[in-house]
């Protein structure tokens, strides 16, 4: 890493012993060792986070590609089931879409019951439409 040889390490140890003295040298060595281990752990943490982010980005790109390809690559059985789901969703929506004015006049005394089925129907049909797209 630093390309330091054995004799260079011995020279650094002798200089450190002379400068720091025998009382403070062990404490200084521990401090340097803690700093080096903290730096290594921080570098590994950053490396792991970058690898995780790259995996997430790759998965997002694959998802975008799959969405762009749409449902063209589906098997015929899946395409038939998607089409039947689309038709069922349209059939369910037709009666309610054609009669909101007649229901409003007949259920004007209880307005909460008139709006409740529409909310349920819309929320139930949205996932089918999203899947179909």
Curated annotation (Swiss-Prot):
Annotated transmembrane regions: 1-21
Membrane topology summary: Single-pass membrane protein
Predominant subcellular localization, coarse grouping: membrane
GO terms for biological process, alphabetical: protein transport by the Tat complex
Gene Ontology MF, one: protein transmembrane transporter activity
Compositionally biased intervals (Low complexity): 97-116
Region (Disordered): 67-133
Biased composition (Polar residues): 70-84
Keywords of the record: Cell inner membrane, Cell membrane, Membrane, Protein transport, Translocation, Transmembrane, Transmembrane helix, Transport
InterPro entries named among the record's database cross-references: TatA/B/E, TatB
A single cellular component GO annotation: TAT protein transport complex
Function summary: Part of the twin-arginine translocation (Tat) system that transports large folded proteins containing a characteristic twin-arginine motif in their signal peptide across membranes. Together with TatC, TatB is part of a receptor directly interacting with Tat signal peptides. TatB may form an oligomeric binding site that transiently accommodates folded Tat precursor proteins before their translocation.
Quaternary structure note: The Tat system comprises two distinct complexes: a TatABC complex, containing multiple copies of TatA, TatB and TatC subunits, and a separate TatA complex, containing only TatA subunits. Substrates initially bind to the TatABC complex, which probably triggers association of the separate TatA complex to form the active translocon.
Similarity field: Belongs to the TatB family.
Name the record gives this protein: Sec-independent protein translocase protein TatB
Organism ancestry: Bacteria, Pseudomonadati, Pseudomonadota, Gammaproteobacteria, Vibrionales
């Amino acid at each position: 890493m630093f390309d330091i040889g054995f004799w260079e390490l011995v020279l650094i140890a002798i200089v450190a012993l002379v400068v720091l003295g025998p009382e403070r040298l062990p404490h200084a060595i521990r401090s340097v060792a803690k700093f080096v281990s903290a730096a290594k752990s921080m570098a590994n943490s950053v490396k792991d986070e970058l690898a995780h982010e790259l995996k997430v980005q790759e998965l997002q790109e694959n998802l975008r590609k799959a969405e762009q390809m749409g449902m063209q690559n589906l098997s015929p059985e899946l395409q038939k089931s998607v089409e039947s789901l689309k038709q069922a969703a349209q059939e369910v929506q037709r009666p309610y879409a054609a009669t909101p004015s007649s229901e409003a006049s007949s259920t004007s005394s209880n307005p909460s019951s008139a709006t409740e089925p529409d909310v349920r129907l819309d929320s139930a049909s949205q996932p089918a439409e999203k899947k179909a797209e």
